Amino acid sequence: MNDLAETEQKMGSLNHSFVQTRLAGLLFNDERFTTLVELSLEVSQIDLSQFGLKAKDELKPDICLYPKGKFCLRRRDLLRISEMPLLAIEIISPRQYLDDILAKFEAYFALDIKTCWLVTPVLESINVYSQTLDNFKSFAVSRDDTEIIDEILNIRLSLQQVFKETNV
C-alpha cells in the first residue's frame, strides 16, 4: 500500500465526516465555484519531500474549490487532476498530526493554491491561510465568531452552519 493510501485510511471519523459534508454542502451553494471532495491532485511537478511529505505524486484535500464550469462528468474518468484548485480544505481527524497538514499547506502554496483552510472539528474552529503559513486568520465558535471569512476568494460562511445541527 502506498503512503497516501495508508494516510487516507487513518482519517475517517464521525466529526471529520460531519464537518466535511456540511462544508461541502455550504460551498456547493456558491454559484461561483465547483466543490469537489477527496479529489486526487497530480503534483509530480514538485518534489514533495522538500516539505517533509512521504507522498510522491499526489495529494488529496478533503475538499477543494474550482471556478464554476471547470469540470463536468466525463465518459472516461480522470484519476488525478493536474490543475490546482483555488482552495484546499483539510479537516484534522484524531489520528492526524497538525504538522503533517501544515506541510501539505506548504506544498499547496508552492503549487499556487490561493488559500487553505484548516478545520478542527473538536475545537469548532477554522484557520484560513492565505499564500503562506504565517498569513492566517482564525475563526472559532468559542470566541463567538459568527462567520468564516476568506478574503482572497470572497467567501463568507456561517460557523454555526458548519459545526452545529440547525433547523432551517
Please describe what each predicted stretch is:
Residues 1-168:
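Gly/Pro/Ser/Thr-rich low-complexity, intrinsically disordered segments predominantly at protein N-termini
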